[in-house]
């Protein structure tokens, strides 16, 4: 088993979210919307429960990434886990959704491809939680 770096785990999460948005744009948007989280009664759509579980899986992957990175000393140790997870998810998905919705504008006004724009955004987010190394 190869040793994963914190940065490569992060890139894997970003790629997974991009792939999810490209393959299932409707569900990707749905994960970001307000959905029913009460599944005790039968007053919900099957898609809501599925979307909830996908969201929970994404939260868990981000949580493991943050915990591992903090443990290794790659990520800031002052991160509050649950708020960080939710903010992280919001920032990454916002970058992805914005790139999908505004691809033509990004190309025309910035001269960047959709992927270049997302990579830049992803690196800004990562740098905000990474430990600053002084050389």
For the regions a protein language model found, what residue spans apply to each?
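Hydrophobic alpha-helical connector segments
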Residues: 1-27, 81, 85-88
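Hydrophobic alpha-helical transmembrane segments
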Residues: 2-3, 31, 62-66
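Alpha-helix C-capping/helix-to-loop hinge sites
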Residues: 3, 72-73
């Amino acid at each position: 088993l190869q040793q994963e770096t914190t940065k490569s785990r992060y890139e894997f999460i970003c790629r997974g979210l991009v792939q999810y948005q490209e393959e299932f744009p409707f569900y990707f948007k749905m994960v970001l919307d307000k959905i029913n989280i009460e599944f005790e009664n039968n007053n919900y759509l099957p898609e809501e429960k599925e979307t909830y579980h996908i969201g929970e899986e994404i939260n868990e992957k981000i949580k493991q990434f943050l915990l591992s990175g903090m443990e290794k000393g790659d990520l800031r140790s002052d991160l509050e886990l649950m708020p960080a997870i939710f903010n992280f998810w919001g920032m990454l998905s916002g970058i992805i959704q914005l790139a999908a919705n505004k691809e033509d504008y990004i190309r025309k006004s910035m001269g960047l491809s959709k992927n270049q724009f997302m990579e830049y955004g992803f690196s800004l987010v990562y740098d905000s939680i990474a430990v600053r190394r002084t050389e």
